[in-house]
Amino acid sequence: MNFINKYLRNLKPYKLASHKIWAVDPKDRKGILKLDWNEATVAPSPKVEARVRELLDGPGFFNLYPTTKNDRLLAAISCFIGLPEENIQYFGSSDVLHEYICRSFLCEDDKVIVLGPSYDNFRLTCQSVGAEVSFFNYNKEDFTFDAAAFEAVLAEKKPVMVYICNPNNPTGNYHTPEYVQHLLETFPQTLFLLDEAYNEFAGPSSKDLVLKYDNIIVTRTLSKAFAMANFRIGYLLASEENIAAIGKIRNPKNISTLSQEAAIAALEDADYMRAYVEKVHEGQAYFVEQMARYADRITVFPSRGNFNLLRFASKEEKSALIKHLADNDIFVRETTQDPSVESCFRVTMGTKDQMKRVVSVIDSFYKK
């Protein structure tokens, strides 16, 4: 007897990158540059550590479930994002949030279009509830976007949901709020899921559109620019009706008190995050400038996120450089989710000093 969910039986799993750093003794991790998961390359705000230590040293509460409605956290998100608390809800990461969205808005055989190649975990989440996922890809040569062709596909297929990672991981494409608004008005019967995991690096958000349109949900995270990946905090911005729908199945007690309080501390020190973003932009500009010396070997695609996609003349050259970087304790992300990125890898951008080290190791590879 096969008890496995019929949608899981032939489901292609999300391919995780190696997380070798956790196999390294903690005292030896300092020299590792982990540039494969688009995490921040610095620690969170010192106020986060101070708050966590305060909790650990204070009266015990770990035997209790966390609060199921943290008004202080909702207020902190509202203050940072500039939207009413009624249009906000927090979750245990945006990955978990995507699962709730799929369970709340998708039924068997519903059509979903992913603008890709993109973050592949969302594809898996949709398919696990029986939705039919197809892709509209950026141009395979240069990852430019054909808006007319995209909209023609939406008009033809009439999807229930469209997923747009903005800026897109791994290609770095960015769509303006004005264009997103155009999509919302042109396709009112389609729910657009805007994944703004990297928005702090990119510029204007589409967040304000949730106050006017009910066919958009924006998801955000503290894992990237706020350097809070280990705390697993994400949040959504949506109409009150859409939040209420997700709330029917949301488990409000699966976010630890430590994570909730750390998130409040991080949001209250948003200037720390903004300073880090500026350092990343500086490091990114330096890296792109230096890679121009290898223009005959490497194509560096422009990006509005804290990462860049690099394409090589051959898969063999790409693989050899990945190994060389790893041998020097620098880990990057091999991209395999689509043929258009098979000769590529993605590099998380860090500070200028960190990117100088990456450039130095790449230089040593090409001087061999």
Where on the chain are the PLM-derived regions?
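Short loop segments at secondary-structure junctions
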Residues: 238-242, 268-269, 312-315, 352-353, ...
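Conserved core of the PLP fold type I
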Residues: 49, 60-187, 198-213, 217
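Short acidic/glycine-enriched loop/turn segments that link adjacent beta-strands
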Residues: 70-71, 230, 304, 339-343
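PLP-dependent enzyme catalytic core of the Aspartate aminotransferase-like
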Residues: 327-328, 337-368
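Conserved PLP-binding catalytic core of the aspartate aminotransferase-like
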Residues: 281, 294-328, 345, 349
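N-terminal small-domain helix-loop-helix segment of the aminotransferase-like
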Residues: 2, 9-93, 100
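PLP-dependent aminotransferase class I/II
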Residues: 43-45, 215-293, 299-301
